[in-house]
Regions:
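Bacterial N-terminal signal peptides
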Residues: 10-18
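N-terminal pre-catalytic segment of deacetylase/amide-hydrolase enzymes
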Residues: 22-82, 245-255, 299, 313-334
Length: 334
C-alpha cells in the first residue's frame, strides 16, 4: 500500500507540472535609488531595464491576485509569468519606483512592515492610501520584522509561535483599521520560517506566503513557500536577470533532506526534469558540496554550523537548468 501511495504521489507531481505549463518568477526589491544601503538598493534605471527584459522575453506580468488564482486553480497560464514585489515599505518605493511602475503599466505588491509605517524612511498612511487607489497591492510583512525562528534559541516553540501569531494579528488589525482592507498574503521577515508558521497563516485565512529563496516557482511547491528572486547590487544586472528567467523549476518527490545533530543529509529523487544528466548541490555555508547522481537521485552530506542555510539542488537534462532552493534551519546553529 505504501509503495502504491508513493507511486501515486510521484505521478501526481509530474501531472501537476505538465498541467501547469508555465513557471512564475517573483522579483523582490527593497530600496530604490538609495546609495546609503547598497546591499538592499536597486537603481530605477535597473528597474526599467528589468521591465523591458520581461516584456522583450514575452513573459506575462501578473498581480499577486493573479498568482493566487493560478495557485488555487482558477487561472490558467499559457506562458511564463513574472510578479513584482517590494519588501518593507521604504519611502523610496513611493518617491522613485512608483512612477516607473506606473509609466510602464506594471502592477506590483508592497509587503509592509506595519510597525514602521510613518517613520522617516518609510511610507506614510497617506502614501499607502494613494497607492491603493491606483491599484498597488499591499501585504503583510509582520508588525515588528522579527526573525521569528531565531527566537527558538531563548524560548520554546509554542512561545515563539504565539509571539508570531500576536505580531501577525497586530499587523492585520492596524492595516484594517487604517485602510479598511484585509491582507491575505505574507512575506516571512528575512525569508526565515518553520512549517508551523505556515500552518498559523493558513488558520488565519492567509492564501499565499513568500520566502527569500531564489528560483522559479512551480505550483507543486504549494502556497506557503513561494520563492522570490532578489534583484539588487550585482544581482540587478541585465545578464543576471536574463539568467534567472531562463531557469526552470526543479521538482522533487518529497522533502529532499534531513538535518540531524548538525549533519545535513540530502537524498533527492528528482521528478522534473525526467532525465537528469548532471546535478549539483550547493549549501550557502559551504558552497558546492560533494554529491553523486544515481537513477535521477542526487545524494550528498555535510556538517553545518550556522543557524540558517540555503540548500540549492540544480540539475540539467542537456538543454536547460532546473533548480530549487530550500531553507535549512538549524535551531542549535550559530
Amino acid at each position: 500500500m505504501k509503495m502504491l501511495s508513493r507511486k501515486f504521489m510521484v505521478l501526481l507531481l509530474v501531472l501537476l507540472c505538465v498541467l501547469a505549463q508555465a513557471k512564475v518568477v517573483v522579483f523582490l526589491y527593497h530600496r530604490f535609488d538609495d546609495a546609503r544601503y547598497p546591499s538592499t538598493n536597486t537603481w530605477t534605471e535597473e528597474l526599467e531595464r528589468h521591465i523591458k527584459i520581461v516584456k522583450e522575453l514575452d513573459f506575462d506580468i501578473w498581480t499577486i491576485k493573479d498568482l493566487e488564482d493560478y495557485v488555487y486553480g482558477s487561472k490558467k497560464a499559457n506562458k511564463d509569468a513574472v510578479v513584482f514585489t517590494v519588501d518593507d515599505g521604504y519611502r523610496s518605493v513611493y518617491e522613485h519606483a512608483y512612477k516607473v511602475f506606473q509609466s510602464h503599466g506594471v502592477p506590483f505588491c508592497v509587503f509592509l512592515q506595519i510597525g514602521a509605517v510613518g517613520y522617516s524612511d518609510y511610507l506614510t498612511w497617506e502614501m499607502i492610501d494613494e497607492m491603493i487607489r491606483n491599484g498597488v497591492e499591499f501585504a503583510n510583512h509582520s508588525f515588528s520584522h522579527t526573525d521569528f525562528p531565531a527566537l527558538l534559541s531563548k524560548m520554546s516553540e509554542n512561545q515563539m509561535l504565539e509571539y508570531f501569531k500576536t505580531d501577525l494579528m497586530k499587523a492585520q488589525r492596524i492595516f484594517k483599521e487604517r485602510t479598511g482592507k484585509t491582507m491575505v498574503y505574507y512575506a516571512y521577515p528575512y525569508g526565515h520560517y518553520i512549517p508551523k508558521m505556515a500552518e498559523i497563516l493558513q488558520q488565519e485565512g492567509f492564501l499565499l506566503a513568500f520566502s527569500q529563496n531564489p528560483g522559479p516557482y512551480d505550483v507543486s511547491y504549494g502556497a506557503f513557500e513561494i520563492p522570490r528572486e532578489p534583484l539588487l547590487e550585482d544581482w540587478a544586472t541585465e545578464s543576471h536577470v536574463r539568467y534567472i528567467l531562463s531557469r526552470e523549476p526543479l521538482v522533487t518527490e518529497n522533502l529532499p533532506f534531513v538535518l540531524q545533530n548538525g549533519i545535513l543529509t540530502v537524498k533527492s529523487k528528482i521528478v522534473v526534469p525526467k532525465e537528469v544528466r548532471y546535478a549539483t548541490l550547493y549549501v550557502s555555508e559551504k558552497g558546492l558540496i560533494k554529491s553523486r547522481l544515481e537513477n535521477n537521485t542526487v545524494f550528498g552530506e555535510t556538517a553545518l554550523k550556522k543557524m540558517y542555510n540555503r540548500l540549492m539542488i540544480s540539475a540539467r537534462d542537456g538543454k536547460k537548468e532546473y533548480l530549487r532552493y530550500y531553507l535549512v534551519f538549524n535551531a542549535q546553529g550559530e
